[in-house]
Design a protein with these regions (language model features):
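Active-site neighborhoods and metal-handling regions in enzymes and metal-associated proteins
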Residues: 1-178
Length: 178
């Protein structure tokens, strides 16, 4: 979707609020917090930095971080475990959306390896974007890199999407993207 200059400014403000939310959250994270508690911290910060959540916040630890839309539960954050955060604030009706996977203390070797693969796939996809490309073509750049690394079957979601008044707007960067 094409955004006016006013809409772009509003989206940048929502995304900046989301960045501030993450910066405020990180010092509050500690080992032993449950997914539920972490999600509630995110919700509280979404109220502080925006006008609440743009969508239901996801916080998941350990093996749960591999589930794209895991419902937070009682599992607790342990040393070196991945912590997946998927959250966004709503600010002046515009939605932000951010997914981050972090690890407290020293992340395990597999986490570091997978993080490098995903980071490189994302970098390649962004670098490949050209006028006229479809979302499907951009998604394929990342999907190809992850597949060549041996993890293609684990890539069960799209690469990304546009933002606006709704959290999921066009374009869609996925195998079905336009």
């Amino acid at each position: 979707a094409i955004k006016s200059a006013r809409e772009q400014k509003a989206l940048r403000r929502a995304i900046a609020a989301n960045d501030a939310l993450l910066a405020a959250l990180l010092p509050q994270l500690r080992l032993g917090l449950s997914e539920w508690e972490i999600r509630n911290l995110l919700r509280r910060e979404a109220d502080r930095f925006g006008q609440g959540e743009a969508f239901d916040t996801i916080a998941c630890v350990g093996a749960n971080a591999a589930e794209c839309h895991h419902v937070p539960g009682d599992d607790v954050l342990g040393p070196g475990q991945p912590l997946l955060l998927d959250f966004g604030v709503r600010l002046d009706h515009y939605c932000a959306d951010m997914t981050r996977c972090i690890a407290p203390q020293r992340p395990r070797a597999l986490f570091r390896k997978l993080h490098r693969i995903v980071h490189e796939a994302n970098r390649r996809a962004i670098a490949a974007i050209r006028p006229g490309m479809t979302g499907q073509e951009v998604d394929e750049v990342a999907r190809s890199h992850i597949g060549k690394a041996g993890y293609g079957k684990a890539f069960g979601h799209g690469l990304g999407h546009g933002l606006g008044l709704e959290v999921h707007e066009g374009p869609s960067f996925s195998p079905r993207g336009t």
